[in-house]
Amino acid sequence: MKAKLILENGVVFEGKAFGYLKECVGEVVFNTGMTGYQEVLTDPSYYGQIVTMTYPLIGNYGINLEDLESKEPKVRGFIVREKCQYPNNFRCELELETYLAQNKVLGLDGIDTRALTKILRNNGTMKGIIVLDNSNLEDVKDKLEAFSNRDAVSIVSTNEKYEISGEGKKVAIIDFGIKQNIIRNFVKRGCNVTVFPYDFKAEEVLEINPDLVFLSNGPGDPEDMGEAVNEIKKIVGKKPIVGICLGHQLLALTLGGETKKLKFGHRGCNHPVKDLINNRVHITSQNHGYYVATLPENMEITHVSMNDGTVEGMKHKELPIFSVQFHPEACPGPKDSEYIFDEFMKYAL
């Protein structure tokens, strides 16, 4: 079936719909990864977004049900230049189209993803809607204006506290939309993990007497998370705190810093980051649309983006606080920076 992507600036791309055949609206972004599309589909940080893959052929190795970052896809829509018709891999369990159809995600195939990416790069991230050939186009503008991703964290976070037993350090994880491979990295280091929902209370976290508090990744604008920031403030100085992505941004706000929105975000598996402590450059996996713009004097920048110079890591000069903007757990992407989890554990009591 024919379908169209209509951007809020009026630009239209025509292609073919696949997967679940129902229109979708969201924030249109692009990811530069050559592989890792199933991790992208299931990464909670992509909630509310229509993701464009810049690599021209997607679906080559199908879908396996082991490498998912959450139980089901979190994207609103999925745009590719060409979907692979005949995936081939010994781990393949489903074709991409079948997986999207089963999980009610609309795909768009056959558009010029290079041209779309250039529009997003030059004009910035914007809202968009994928409509089917038989859709009513009269209310498209109203649907775009009505779309909001403000409550995304409440949707992707766990609903209740749960524990994964281990013999090592006790880690309290605040789930703002955590990827499963982050949890796996703590578990394989022997940690006794307790995961709290996004609307946690500091008293509940401190009650389990954790050796380390971890703030997870997640979708949306960190400035919408005022209640979480207030609770984090109650933990600062009482327990070591580390974080990734949204957790990194929330820590910055907690300590008096400022966050802003990037023009088109960092999304992909090939983002170079310089470690200022070790004077080394790592290729990292990233997925964020906001960044830490300013920091108070008691914070030290530890990592910076080699592409645009934005803050990619920070630590407190006196308190046991450390966080990074990139994703050291990869999935997808290189594991150059997986050592960050060992750095996290050095902060544990």
Curated annotation (Swiss-Prot):
Biological process annotations from GO? 'de novo' pyrimidine nucleobase biosynthetic process; 'de novo' UMP biosynthetic process; glutamine metabolic process; L-arginine biosynthetic process
Family (UniProt): Belongs to the CarA family.
SMART domains per UniProt: CPSase_sm_chain
Q: Which residues form the Glutamine amidotransferase type-1 domain?
A: 170-349
Q: In which pathway does it act?
A: Amino-acid biosynthesis; L-arginine biosynthesis; carbamoyl phosphate from bicarbonate: step 1/1; Pyrimidine metabolism; UMP biosynthesis via de novo pathway; (S)-dihydroorotate from bicarbonate: step 1/3
Q: What CDD domains does this protein's entry cite?
A: GATase1_CPSase
At the highest ranks, the source species' classification is:
Bacteria, Bacillati, Bacillota, Clostridia, Eubacteriales
Q: EC number(s) on record?
A: 6.3.5.5
- UniProt GO MF annotations: ATP binding; carbamoyl-phosphate synthase (glutamine-hydrolyzing) activity; glutaminase activity
The answer to whether keyword Phosphoprotein applies is no
Indicate the quaternary assembly.
Composed of two chains; the small (or glutamine) chain promotes the hydrolysis of glutamine to ammonia, which is used by the large (or ammonia) chain to synthesize carbamoyl phosphate. Tetramer of heterodimers (alpha,beta)4.
Please list the reactions this protein catalyses. hydrogencarbonate + L-glutamine + 2 ATP + H2O = carbamoyl phosphate + L-glutamate + 2 ADP + phosphate + 2 H(+)
- In residue numbers, the region (CPSase) covers 1-170
Give the InterPro entries listed for this entry.
Anth_synth/Amidotransfase, CarbamoylP_synth_ssu, CarbamoylP_synth_ssu_N, CarbP_synth_ssu_N_sf, Class_I_gatase-like, CPSase_GATase1, GATASE
Instruction: Tell me which UniProt keywords the record has, alphabetically.
Output: Amino-acid biosynthesis, Arginine biosynthesis, ATP-binding, Glutamine amidotransferase, Ligase, Nucleotide-binding, Pyrimidine biosynthesis
**Active site location:** C245 (nucleophile), H327, E329
Summarizing the function annotation, the protein's role is: Small subunit of the glutamine-dependent carbamoyl phosphate synthetase (CPSase). CPSase catalyzes the formation of carbamoyl phosphate from the ammonia moiety of glutamine, carbonate, and phosphate donated by ATP, constituting the first step of 2 biosynthetic pathways, one leading to arginine and/or urea and the other to pyrimidine nucleotides. The small subunit (glutamine amidotransferase) binds and cleaves glutamine to supply the large subunit with the substrate ammonia.
Q: Quick check: keyword Ribonucleoprotein in the entry?
A: no
Cross-referenced Pfam families? CPSase_sm_chain (PF00988), GATase (PF00117)
Biological source species:
Clostridium perfringens (strain 13 / Type A)
* Coiled-coil region(s): none
Q: What class of enzyme is it?
A: ligase
Know the name of this protein? Answer: Carbamoyl phosphate synthase small chain
- Write out the residues that bind L-glutamine: S45, G218, G220, L246, Q249, N287, G289, Y290
